[in-house]
């Protein structure tokens, strides 16, 4: 139980962590209001309907003062009485007209501006008090300001220059407000918009401004809002981030602060400039290992109280050259104040990075403080500040830390759409208890989003997208460009339950809720989660207001639980509701049964509109969105069971059941444990099978290894000795391993004469002469044996020829043998079976011949074949080591001759008798390279041919490289004196790699000709000739003396070469052949 509880805790922490670091997904709206429904909302265009001759509105700003809405545009200011509820069109009650003079327009045209720009666009409309309002306009690029009476909009007073109070161009942004009788404005102060300024004018005292052309203070700003709070005035804007100039041009959102009692600096420092100007970054980002920032501030609200905390809420977007993305972030004023009390940021050199300033380097009083308040309480005015403080604030206006959002994350994000959010308005007291916060956000596409905000970090629910409203009306508003669809501003009229959405050419009034759409469908009303709507006891869904009794309505804003409610099939909406048509269709994951909805296939109009405007909603229920369309009012009568003005939901019986969170977590845990168990069993079974397979493979490898001979005991049939032959040095000491083969079980003395070991008392060669040696035993690869079946007939003919022409057994020397009792060669030559053929010795012949010989040498029974095979392998390996010991010049011949009988028994050798009729089972390797001459007798035994110590030809490069010592005991290879053994014209041939070798090479120039038995032999004087094999040789292959090429194999003494029996040849030395 404790483990299960611990597991649940860990799972909860992991889920919380994932929710914190994962990028939020876009929510689908619970309700959608498209153009067909929103087109009924009243629109303000600045001119009466049908009068298209008047100019467009060119909306600039909108301000609500008490029960009047002021709309400023080009050359005019309109007033709208909010107490009058419009039906189809918003009619202004009053209008202020202020046009530019003719001279100003002509001057504007002379400056190169278009005539449409040379008008008076009202950019400033700020109340001075309850009676007067301060109005400024661009006045054809010559800004001017006036005072007007607020109630009558009559001109009062004289014109004032609008320089540094109003921009020159209507496309430039600006903000302004009165605080303590002084006008605080932020705009550009020149025609080219290069001098951005935050300016204070009017009232007592001198005018103050920011430092001109100082990028550390302001760099290409875009001012959005100004508010008064406490002893300060705050400006919200975006600008080019000066701290990231080295990394590129990036836009950051800023909040700047100045003291209302700032009087400027002394005559030495910051005279007529702000002494309290500070700015900090607004950080609106998605948390995680790598933050995703929304850096561009688009709009921000006034200070509102959210959960008792003074807060500003803004909408932020990504950079202009980035992917579209928007977020809504809230910042508390306390967090902003905290940042301004933090550390400063500085750049020591123009090329260095920006770093934080240590606290010990900050002068006293602290820069940014207001005189007579806080740390600067001892100073009456800012003029009295020390020069160190003024100099520091002049070069360090930027704070090091950024202002974090509430809960360190956005309230709402929108990233899966192609538009950005541009305007924001907040109702902080929504619902009958005024305890909900609803955010209205405008976008570039003319869509207004209605969001139920998550205002507490401990809230269990995230922000919910309640509605998506298409507020733009292309039929009544200008549609000249995509910019006309952009929402410029939003104004909330909570008293009259309305929201004014401003576009460049019109203003649309939309209600805050559409409770009448749900009609008498309780399930749709509750599922909407709209804090403005509730289900009344009268059986209708209507707007709930403050003061209604709790028992008089029902709503579920937190969860929208409708599991206990049935489907909607009841009555029709009130008669005051306009006609509707079907919009959309069932969601993508459900299908509407024919019994639930009756469709009319003969109505192409409804089909086209459904396809064009349908937006899928990924929910588990089937939903329809209904909206107004006067042209199809008769069509809705043909659809049975669909009430007008009702968002009708048809759900299956299974979807009404909800699963409790504990049950869901338990199921997930059980599934995880079961999956882990199954995975463990699968891994165990797989591992067991894999281990068994490896053991079987290992066992097969060992058995295959035991069936093979030593490295020098088989012939390579597929390549005819591709690699150079191993050669062994004569003076290698014999190991002590062979002492057990002797009768006396003692090692031979090192000075024992080995020559006497080779001859018995009858003068015959030793019986060991018939045994194969490592030098004369080729390597047989068994993998190529099956590929040589094509030569089986040759193998049979080869066996028959050997029966007809038996060979001499080496135990009795031939008549012309030069051997004597006192002399025996140090290497013993075996008869070569390949001399019996006139054709080339193929691989298959060798293989089958050896199989036949093996069957003759080992006539064992089937029952003991495996045991005898292993013993045979061990005997051959031991024999190889013994023969190495026999070749040792320091061996004792008497001890070896005395142990011949025991060696025969130990090595499991066959009697010598059968071998007199059958040749040795292993052919001579050197002799197999040649085809014997046709003139030689078949039965002639092979002879030992010794090479003299001093060769008759120059030493080869291989011999020079190996550095052999010249002594009488050294034996040279026959390849030192090449002899033609098979070529009819006596030419020395070099065997080169060839895929189709069938000819002879001509005699090379510069060759020395010798004669062996009357046949001219070409002796090549070059260092060496290569010997290669052929895979496709046909017919009789020429055999010739060979020369070895240098190789990378270890240095070993050369082995003797063997040739068929010939007549005696006397070279330059004393040896007899």
UniProtKB/Swiss-Prot annotation:
A Pfam family recorded for this sequence: PSI
Tissues showing expression: Expressed in brain and lung.
Annotated GO CC locations: collagen-containing extracellular matrix; Golgi apparatus; plasma membrane
One GO term (biological process): negative regulation of smooth muscle cell migration
Biased composition range(s): Basic and acidic residues: 790-806
Gene Ontology molecular function: receptor ligand activity; semaphorin receptor binding
Biased composition (Polar residues): 931-942, 1021-1037, 1059-1073
Disulfide bridge positions per record: 108-118, 136-145, 259-370, 284-329, 477-506, 515-533, 521-568, 525-541
Sites carrying sugar chains: 51, 283, 435, 461, 631
Family annotation (InterPro entries): Plexin_repeat, Semap_dom, Semap_dom_sf, Semaphorin, WD40/YVTN_repeat-like_dom_sf
Extracellular side stretches: 21-662
Residue spans crossing the bilayer: 663-683
Domain of life where this protein originates: Eukaryota
Residue ranges annotated as Cytoplasmic topological domain: 684-1073
Localization: Cell membrane
Domain Sema: 27-512
Family classification: Belongs to the semaphorin family.
Function of the protein: Shows growth cone collapsing activity on dorsal root ganglion (DRG) neurons in vitro. May be a stop signal for the DRG neurons in their target areas, and possibly also for other neurons. May also be involved in the maintenance and remodeling of neuronal connections. Ligand of TREM2 with PLXNA1 as coreceptor in dendritic cells, plays a role in the generation of immune responses and skeletal homeostasis.
Protein name per the record: Semaphorin-6D
Organism: Mus musculus (Mouse)
